[in-house]
Amino acid sequence: MVNVKASMFLTFAGLVLLFVVCYASESEEKEFPKEMLSSIFAVDNDFKQEERDCAGYMRECKEKLCCSGYVCSSRWKWCVLPAPWRR
């Protein structure tokens, strides 16, 4: 009888250990895509500062200059793409 109880206890302890290991590895796998996306879309503070110095497409250009490749629309005061029909 003692051997049966010991083997049942060891089996139960093994199943609990297996559950803990599987849960830990699954939670790491769930965090991996989040970490990957955050590293892909991470932006340096220097780049953010440069981006704030000029106004991008469809941004107000009253106080800021438009970024390169855009011009300030005289009518709407937005940064737009330069075109032959725009004055």
Curated annotation (Swiss-Prot):
Disulfide topology: C54-C67, C61-C72, C66-C79
Protein family according to the UniProt entry: Belongs to the neurotoxin 10 (Hwtx-1) family. 51 (Hntx-8) subfamily. Hntx-8 sub-subfamily.
Signal sequence range: 1-24
Lineage: Eukaryota, Metazoa, Ecdysozoa, Arthropoda, Chelicerata
Single GO cellular component term: extracellular region
UniProt source species: Cyriopagopus hainanus (Chinese bird spider)
Descriptive protein name: U3-theraphotoxin-Hhn1a 17
Keyword Secreted: yes
SUPFAM superfamilies: omega toxin-like
UniProt superkingdom: Eukaryota
Expression by tissue: Expressed by the venom gland.
GO molecular function: ion channel inhibitor activity; toxin activity
Entry's free-text remark on domains: The presence of a 'disulfide through disulfide knot' structurally defines this protein as a knottin.
Pro-sequence residue ranges: 25-52
Annotated compartments: Secreted
Keyword entries, A-Z: Disulfide bond, Ion channel impairing toxin, Knottin, Secreted, Signal, Toxin
A Pfam cross-reference name: Toxin_12
Function: Ion channel inhibitor.
